[in-house]
């Protein structure tokens, strides 16, 4: 259940990009930390060194509660599994990065929120050979990694060897092969999509049923869907035996836009517009990343204002979803009552 929850509630590609800024600036942040400031997560680092002697190649604190460890690539699945199951970590997100101009390699980051004992963030980093872009898949050991590894494969062309599900995740079926959007040198917009065919190229998987099940397609456009998404229900009579789905129909390529067309101070306007009802959360995430990368101390008053606005936005989102639950069941009067409350709670 935990693995499926975190896969379904994957934390969005925009957040991945801005989190990369924080991680890549690790050297700057490490120097800016006060020597007297307590660094959280030291016992996790000690546990890693004890369980895997000689595997940790480097480590650095980005902030007092954010630790990045670079490990040998062949030990990646074991290290993530150890932190996930033995140390109480939750795999929050994973992403790739093109660091060839920095060190000649690609890199993949697995970000875990440590919830057992001392709470902090630990990011497991591995360098991937630019000439042979392969690394061992974590998914067979930690199933929650499947979405992230599929996305890294799509966007960077880094192959997770042993990944059980090799279907595309973000890119459409007619996207040109060997064109990976988030590589730094991926700027050839002259390539065109492959010709479309009547045959379906994306295979929806029915793991729990068999070929006797009827298939009920829902989407990608449906009256009850807020965003485009295609669901396949495998049914036996009235019982749903299994389900599979495909999202990212409105993927807008915001990372590439921010990277190639905007300065650091202009991305805030883009992050505000990622989502119609949670713009402040996205803009706060980006701003916090830049502040951490630059070693900027945020005034307490600014932190309090952010907390208040984030809480108002959270309540706003809860009310909206409660109203939508009423709408989906045909109780539109309930939806309108919640919508009326939204008018008085909106941060704007």
Each predicted region: which residue ranges?
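A generic alpha-helix preference that emphasizes hydrophobic side chains
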Residues: 2, 149-150, 283, 312
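Catalytic cofactor-binding cores of redox enzymes
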Residues: 167, 173-179, 183-239, 243-346
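Conserved small/polar residues in nucleotide/adenosyl-binding loops
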Residues: 1-3, 344-348
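Terminal low-complexity/charged segments
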Residues: 6-239
